[in-house]
Amino acid sequence: RDTSVTGVQTCALPILREGQGVCVAELSIDDIYLTRAERLELAERVHPLLATRGVPGTHDVALGKAVIGNLRDLGAGETMTLPRFDKSSDDRGPAGEWPEVRGPVDLVIFEGWCVGSMAQPAGDLATPVNRLEADEDSDGTWRHYVNEQLSSAYGELFDMLDALVFLQAPSFDAIPRWRLEQEVKLAESAGAGATHIMDVAGVSRFIQHYERITRPQLAHLR
């Protein structure tokens, strides 16, 4: 009952719930982002680029480990809530609005970008992979910090998984287009309350934060 799977998008949930009668709990790595205030503090203390959510180091790994562990141990009739992150406000959603799950849970789906990724050899960090790294991380502080997180705390989190499913994008070039489509849908669903919706330029910059880890994923996670 405690098998964890990652990389499966939410489109699989109705099939599992209705067709197989499986009790499924879904948690995205996005839902354990540090709060906006915590990321701003990290950006001031370590490197300004850490204000932008997404890369290893911008998640509350302890929260993720606790949630997955509690889901595995959830007994019959017991309930717990799952954290949720509001991308339209770039902050963790109010705890009172977190969804509730009732035990026992048969399957935990832990999905999202960078799940299952591994740290790079130190020598691979020397050369910037894009303009963002060249201009805003010229001394490599940010990318070394991110890499260190992957090799330590994130490795412990990913070790909790029993299986890994990777959905292969056709190329890195497809990712900005998909991200922009998500922003359009997010703006439509959030309405006037959306304060952090990205335009084309914003998406282009945002994706550069992810490039260093995404390209090895596409090459090696198959």
Identify the role of each PLM range.
Residues 2-11:
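Single conserved hydrophobic/aromatic residue that forms the stacking wall/gate
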Residues 11, 101-102, 157:
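Structural alpha-helical scaffold elements that stabilize or flank donor/cofactor-binding regions
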Residues 14-25:
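Post-Walker A helix-loop "phosphate-sensing" segment adjacent to the P-loop in P-loop NTPases
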Residues 25-28, 32-90:
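Conserved nucleotide-sensing/catalytic segment adjacent to the nucleotide-binding pocket
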Residues 77-78, 104-108, 163:
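Loop/turn-to-beta-strand initiation segments
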Residues 91-102:
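Glycine-rich phosphate/ribose-binding loops and adjacent secondary-structure elements
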Residues 108-114:
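Switch II (G3) loop of P-loop NTPases
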Residues 114-222:
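Conserved NTP phosphate-binding and transfer environment spanning the P-loop NTPase/kinase superfamily
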